[in-house]
Amino acid sequence: MNENSVITKTRRRKLCMAASDPEKPLAVITHVAFGSGGVNVSGEPIVPTETQTALNSELARYEVESVTYPDETTARYTVTIPKDSLVGKEINEAALVDSEGDLVAIKNMYSKKKDEGVSFTFEFDDEF
């Protein structure tokens, strides 16, 4: 992971419990959340923290469409923001969300403005 992304402490706690207690299986990734609070006033991505439990300014969540495995320790989640959603919004933060609604990884990036009539397809890699 780069400096603008983080695996949350919530995810690391859940991994620890799942590895040591069969009564606590790991919740699967079901959604990707998008937001507009991932940059500073100069437009540079800010570093997310492992203790974050929410995006700084969440705009929407979308269900994961597919998962691929580009290598044996990476799960790549694909999600599409539809043409009619988030028109005119600047997207600069994203998070993987598990089936319990917890943010498990956060990535901040440069702003991408969503145009009318255009769908955005995002890929988010979960690297182990």
What does each model-found stretch correspond to?
Residues 1-91, 99-128:
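Small cysteine-rich, disulfide-bonded extracellular modules of the LU/uPAR three-finger superfamily
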